[in-house]
Amino acid sequence: TACNPTMSPSICLSPLDRSDTLRYLGMTEAAADNAFLSRLDACEAKLLRHATPRYTYCILPLTRTESVLYADTLLLEGNDIRQHLEGCDRAVLMAATLGTSVDVLIDRTQKRDMTNALLMDALANTAIEQVCDKAEQQIQETMPNRYFTWRFSPGYGDFPISEQPNLLAHLNAARQVGIITTETYLMNPRK
């Protein structure tokens, strides 16, 4: 296989984008009072202490026939992924996580305080997006003068989520960063 997964350089999380977190909660800044924002800040501090952000990636050559797209030996099913990668000769395959301790923290918090667990879950969504953004930036720095599309994942459009295990296996994500999939194709850790 042409995929030789690269372990990530370290990623340090910055303070999380509050507007993104509030959006995940279905809220606006105007709806959040000082007491709520203090609670959110406390949850963020705790979440960031537990997060161990990591990612792995590899760069794969793309080959096409009339109706089929391959990234290395991986068949990429669906019209949407083919359209997304139209004009590209390579694809970056990436997996990222905040680590299992974030899932454990959210699960434990859920047993004691559902509101804080909900806040932490939204914060974790914001945090994993930040990890992916920083990973993407680091990857782009290794490939100057290349065009990059936006990220596309199994489950988007008609790109089947059932492809998740194949992509993660190609990256050796279980060994590289500790990500596996469940029987229903969800990633574990969740974030």
Where are these regions (language model features)?
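Active-site helix-to-loop segments that bind/position phosphate- or nucleotide-bearing substrates
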Residues: C3-M120
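Short terminal or interdomain "cap/linker" segment that borders an active site or interface and mediates
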Residues: L98, N145-K191
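Short, well-ordered, mixed-charge alpha-helical segments that flank or form enzyme active sites
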Residues: V102-V104, A127, D158-S162
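Flexible, glycine/charged-enriched surface loops at secondary-structure junctions
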Residues: P53-L62, Q137-S153
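Compact, glycine/acidic-enriched structural inserts
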Residues: T115-Q137
